[in-house]
């Protein structure tokens, strides 16, 4: 995957527009989770160190396009950046017709979704973005699967279009895990439904050696193998699909599970052998023997891709399976990559973020890359690099 990289460019005195993913949760006018801002900071600092006049843009939330809304304003992000960088970071609302920024200065543009034509990727808007800068830097992997004005359109028209360090690192890590993985490779794919992860499961079945499934997805595979799943969440109409996937790749199934009679924080957890699951049982986690078996598989893997907790880890009594696998990945010498919202929450809960080789910041984009889909914002950078 050949793209121009910001790190290779001379930015001295250049006007640089950086598209970041600063779509963070905001509560009472204050940033509630700063993970995405922290991920973007090194890119912003590097552009400033290289002597650029730096303009940063992002979306936040889902405002009605073309209309300002205070709740979707990036003001809390500008305030956060000012504190984090120890300098004033002005929030600029009217920037489409030009903005004065000097070398070494930094401004944050107001929410790009307040601009008409952003989501439709209108050429007229994209050309206005492009006219603001000498160099456009796409650094928002989390929105790379969307062809929008500030992610794709601007890269068509900017004098120079490059990948930022964060985007480049994502592409390198995903390429390492999927294009030429060190073998054996294990993938953990968990979630409530096979239907939502079908493309991911199919794509990984042709590249990995062990496909570990969890959550409602595992229940469908268990049912496909003729095991009882009680009143657990599963998809009867996808049993044949599960069988077809299991015929292509090794899908180790749980030998024991943690069940309850209800889905609740106060539900009583009981460990049962898979054959003993009763008609009124709900499977809410893998059992301790299964967790140990899966951890052993991970120990011998050279590449591990993790997407989704294997149980209802938000309730502690159903969190052991995810905890054991998280620790196994952390202790492994394998190249490990993890992504997807719930996966990140599990990584935080069990404190293993420093031991995982790469944690992807993109939820939907991560999944689409794993599915083998083309990410429009990356494809345009590749096109521009060829030209």
Swiss-Prot record:
GO molecular function: ADP binding; ATP binding; phosphoglycerate kinase activity
Residue ranges of the TM segments: none
UniProt entry tagged with the keyword Magnesium: no
Gene name for this UniProt entry: pgk
Subcellular location per the Swiss-Prot or TrEMBL entry: Cytoplasm
Entry-linked Gene3D superfamilies: Phosphoglycerate kinase, N-terminal domain (3.40.50.1260)
Organism the protein comes from: Pseudomonas putida (strain ATCC 700007 / DSM 6899 / JCM 31910 / BCRC 17059 / LMG 24140 / F1)
Domain of life according to the entry: Bacteria
UniProt-listed InterPro entries: Phosphoglycerate_kinase (IPR001576), Phosphoglycerate_kinase_CS (IPR015911), Phosphoglycerate_kinase_N (IPR015824), Phosphoglycerate_kinase_sf (IPR036043)
A GO BP annotation: gluconeogenesis
Family designation: Belongs to the phosphoglycerate kinase family.
Description of how the protein assembles with itself and partners: Monomer.
Keywords assigned by UniProt, alphabetized: ATP-binding, Cytoplasm, Glycolysis, Kinase, Nucleotide-binding, Transferase
GO-annotated cellular components: cytosol
Pathway: Carbohydrate degradation; glycolysis; pyruvate from D-glyceraldehyde 3-phosphate: step 2/5
Residues reported to bind ATP: 197, 314, 340-343
Recorded catalytic activity of this chain's protein: (2R)-3-phosphoglycerate + ATP = (2R)-3-phospho-glyceroyl phosphate + ADP
Residue sites binding substrate per the record: 21-23, 36, 59-62, 113, 146
Name listed for the protein in its UniProt record: Phosphoglycerate kinase
Cross-referenced Pfam families: PGK
EC number(s) from the headed UniProt entry: 2.7.2.3
